Amino acid sequence: MARITVEDCQERVDNRFLLVQMAIKRVHQYREGYEALVDSRNKEVVTALREIAAGKVLPDEEARYVETEEDFRAE
């Protein structure tokens, strides 16, 4: 089983406070009905970190919400 660490995510997002904010916002999106972008049987927070480490989610310019690959395809 692969372990996810904050260091794995910081390769994509260098600001750890922004990283935490992104993970929280992504968990809120799951609870609103968004689907996970990676296969994971873990808790929501771990799934969010896996998505960030995989580059599947990115912060928007104002960090109000997290953009997913699906958001980019819709544009």
UniProtKB/Swiss-Prot annotation:
It comes from the Bacteria. It is an enzyme of class 2 (transferase). Disulfide bonds: none annotated. One of its GO terms (molecular function) is DNA-directed RNA polymerase activity. Keywords: DNA-directed RNA polymerase, Nucleotidyltransferase, Transcription, Transferase. It catalyses: RNA(n) + a ribonucleoside 5'-triphosphate = RNA(n+1) + diphosphate. One of its GO terms (cellular component) is DNA-directed RNA polymerase complex. InterPro entries: DNA-dir_RNA_pol_omega, Pol_omega/Rpo6/RPB6, RPB6/omega-like_sf. Its EC number is 2.7.7.6. Gene3D superfamilies: 3.90.940.10. GO terms for biological process: DNA-templated transcription. Pfam families: RNA_pol_Rpb6. Coiled coil: none annotated. HAMAP family: RNApol_bact_RpoZ. Promotes RNA polymerase assembly. Latches the N- and C-terminal regions of the beta' subunit thereby facilitating its interaction with the beta and alpha subunits. NCBIfam families: rpoZ. This is DNA-directed RNA polymerase subunit omega. It comes from Nitratidesulfovibrio vulgaris (strain DSM 19637 / Miyazaki F).
